Amino acid sequence: MTKDFDVIVLGAGINGCGIARDLSLRGLKVALIERHDIAHGASSNNTGMIHGGIRYLQYDVATTKESCTDAGYIERIAPHLLMRIPFLFPVFSGEPVARLLLEGVETFFEAYDYYQPLKGGKKHCRLSRNEILNLEPGLREDVIGGVTLDEWGVDAFRLTLLNAIDAHENGTDVRTYHEVVDFVQNASGAVVGVKLFDRRSKTMNELHAPITINATGAWGPRVAAKLGIPYRLRQGKGVHVVFSHRVSNLGLIIKGVDGRQMFFLPHQNHTVIGTTDDDYYSDLDAPLVLEDEVKYILQAARHVFAGIDKHRPSYTYVGVRPTLFGWGKNEDALSREHAFIEHQIDGVDGLISIMGGKLAAYRILSEEVSDVVAKRLGNQAKCVTHERPLPGGAHLDEPKTLSELVLKRRYGQRAIAVQKLGTETVCICENVSDGAVRYAKQQEFANCLLDVCKRTGLGLGACGGLHCLHTASTVFMEGANVAVSNRFAELKDAMDTRFKARNMVLTGANLQTEELSRAKHYLTGGLHRLMSEAAGKKNIQFTPFSFSPAQSQLTLSKENN
């Protein structure tokens, strides 16, 4: 049987992309397969922090040390994606033995200081009541003191994407929207390839390699089950609530009514609050944000930041973590370590499954797995992912303008390539240009409008995409000969996805206003009419068109039936 590749990696989340990058940099021929888009699951639906895992210090010191070490590497290879977030652990007079608690928190943070140098972090400091209220006047006034904490925030989606791009630029065949329907096995039962269904072209194809890596995250057991291999995870559902602006000056460590620790943090130009952590047994492909989960998060925020009700949440998001299985523990106490299984122990050689892990430790996990794979294939090249910058991460100049700063935060050194493709503003809320839309299509594996949204932040602002998605769609479809029905189906999918994320945090008059605004944009763009028209005419084609707030213009070329 022909060997198409040395290694097939299933799953383009942070671990899959990290492994593909590591292996390709060692000179191996790699295929990276993803059923949806890059970073579809928990890799983009997390808190967005490369933190050292202070919450794990109580249960899991090894994970804290590992996370801090890898956070230091990530800060050096992707400085344009990381931002320093100063946190505060506030203590209030209403807490049981508040003064004693404050002393205990400081002692705990002193222990964490030991690991801070590994990630370029700053040591803690203790603040008085007056110092805290000067820095964060929105806090409850009965705060008696607090302790600071230094952590890194990150654009988690782009971190995953840049690993995929670097892998691709070093020879990896990246295939998104390809679903594994079966494995190819030889006479002895070893896995020697995969059968794939291309979800866009609706075609089947087959790839072969001596080693396949199952890095599909929470979907891992489902993939392994195709071979009759049982293994268990504790899938954990995590929900976040997002505000489209900065509510606080500092990140805050807060607690839910049940004592669960959460983060309340300024993240780029947004505010993110979360996460919940609950065992999850339902549909992995369609986890839903529940009203009770939103209320739980906002209740925790309100408990320390009374002014939160003056701000309107913008949207929510949810992810499912592939946490290592453990019986008899609550979700917080589960290990965030990672592991991998070589399935020859199950009688199926050629397959390795990845389990557990966390964003901050993805690079170390990738190195460990790649070391094993390289050894099995007789490859003696060493890992270089801890010292080689990710795309755009080398030789950064200081930005001279705000717009340049935004570009460099997303693209680093490659911002100039984005500017060459266009500088007209498409999205005012997130400062997205037409060049960024074109760059996503040409260089970042964007296959549809929703893919562009994930790469650029389109639609994450206060308007929910209603003011920018039409224009972005026009730019994205430049020069394409695509059926009107497909063109508008993509636009509708992007708008509906954004509305779904906003729906759970909008109530009363706000929800009614949102629905009226959506209806207006559907009508202004003629979306409802054209979708109906396209359904009745098989051969309608479109050429690029543009929308303006006052009038929408559309040029259609029709073939007579």
Feature map (PLM): residue ranges:
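N-terminal Rossmann-fold NAD(P) dinucleotide-binding loop
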Residues: 16
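Glycine-rich FAD pyrophosphate-binding loop
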Residues: 24-44
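Dinucleotide-binding Rossmann-like beta1-alpha1 core, especially the glycine-rich loop
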Residues: 48-135
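Beta1/beta-strand and adjacent pyrophosphate-binding region of the FAD-binding site
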Residues: 2-13
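C-terminal catalytic lobe of FAD-dependent flavoproteins
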Residues: 166, 232-239, 243-248, 255-272, ...
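Flavin (primarily FAD) binding-site architecture
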Residues: 214-228
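Short hydrophobic core segments
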Residues: 10, 207-217
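Helical element adjacent to the flavin cofactor pocket in flavoenzyme catalytic cores
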Residues: 147-207
